[in-house]
Amino acid sequence: MLILGVESSCDETGIALYDSEAGLLSHALYSQVAMHAEYGGVVPELASRDHIRRVVPLLREALGQAGKMLDEVDAVAYTRGPGLAGALLVGCAFAEALALAIDKPTIPVHHLEGHLLSPLLSSDPPTFPFVALLVSGGHTQLMKVTGVGEYELLGETLDDAAGEAFDKSAKLLGLPYPGGALLSKLAEQGTPGVHELPRPMLHSGDLSFSFSGLKTAVLTLVREHADAMSDEFKANAARAFQEAIVEVLVKKSLKAMKQTGLKQLVVAGGVGANKQLRTTLNDEAKRKRFRVYYPELEFCTDNGAMIALAGCLRLQSGSPSKAAGSFAVQPRWPLMEMSVSPTK
């Protein structure tokens, strides 16, 4: 079964081909980061227009990489939500029209489910069940995953997501867009212990997160040093911020592992690429004897490969596809609303 995946939820356009037996055959990706950097963040209208420009060339690239013809595709999976409404509509309309043209069904996919399942693209994938830490610019959640579409929410952020806190704190430190990754690199140059920042909800007793207070603490720190914003200060502040957020993510994840009794942890989403987070979790995994899995770095950001994979696994788990032509997107779409509906 050959699945074509289309991703367009924000500022990356991705097209991929996934075979149920051979695995990932190709994936083509275009990032709009350079375009949005001029504005200091994603401009939704510009994102939508650029998706329109990129989808057809990327489709040709993906087909060429895989050595496949369009009529060999068995179904077209696409991101239905959550995300930017206009950006989602571009990918949705493209996928539905393409499927209609080749008389194949479509599979609407949840963007976060794509991230959640992306470690299954690796050569050493996790097996169900496992605990998942989803950390991105828009979401921070801990879940118990027992199968495709079988998700139990253990805890989530009550305000800002971890990735959002990274980006906003980077902006406070005067770093250009996209700031989160730059803050992480800057933190490597910082000295531990120079600044102390709060660990929000670290001892709350539950698995909820809150990062708005940490962002406010960075703002206060910056204001206190407004007359001495040296490179050294920025590096030390970045180090303090990253250590605080990583400690919270790690300790909450360990608590979820203990609470569920599971021995596998999946970390997915853009923040999952953070070096300090990975190093700390790997050390804890060795110490507490559990396994931790991450997507390949190229699949931490938004991509079509994870959408193609999720679509394929959805079909294999019994979720029905639908006839092409009619469609809708869901900019706001809680992952817990997803469920497997076995075909009769």
From Swiss-Prot:
One of its GO terms (biological process) is tRNA threonylcarbamoyladenosine modification. Pfam families: TsaD. GO terms for cellular component: cytoplasm. Fe cation binds at H111, H115, D302. Substrate binds at L134, V135, S136, G137, G138, D167, G180, N274. Signal peptide: none annotated. Its EC number is 2.3.1.234. Keywords: Acyltransferase, Cytoplasm, Iron, Metal-binding, Transferase, tRNA processing. GO terms for molecular function: iron ion binding; N(6)-L-threonylcarbamoyladenine synthase activity. Its cofactor is Fe(2+). Disulfide bonds: none annotated. It catalyses: L-threonylcarbamoyladenylate + adenosine(37) in tRNA = N(6)-L-threonylcarbamoyladenosine(37) in tRNA + AMP + H(+). It comes from the Bacteria. It is found in: Cytoplasm. Binds 1 Fe(2+) ion per subunit. It is an enzyme of class 2 (transferase). HAMAP family: TsaD. NCBIfam families: gcp_kae1, T6A_TsaD_YgjD. Belongs to the KAE1 / TsaD family. Required for the formation of a threonylcarbamoyl group on adenosine at position 37 (t(6)A37) in tRNAs that read codons beginning with adenine. Is involved in the transfer of the threonylcarbamoyl moiety of threonylcarbamoyl-AMP (TC-AMP) to the N6 group of A37, together with TsaE and TsaB. TsaD likely plays a direct catalytic role in this reaction. This is tRNA N6-adenosine threonylcarbamoyltransferase. It comes from Dechloromonas aromatica (strain RCB).
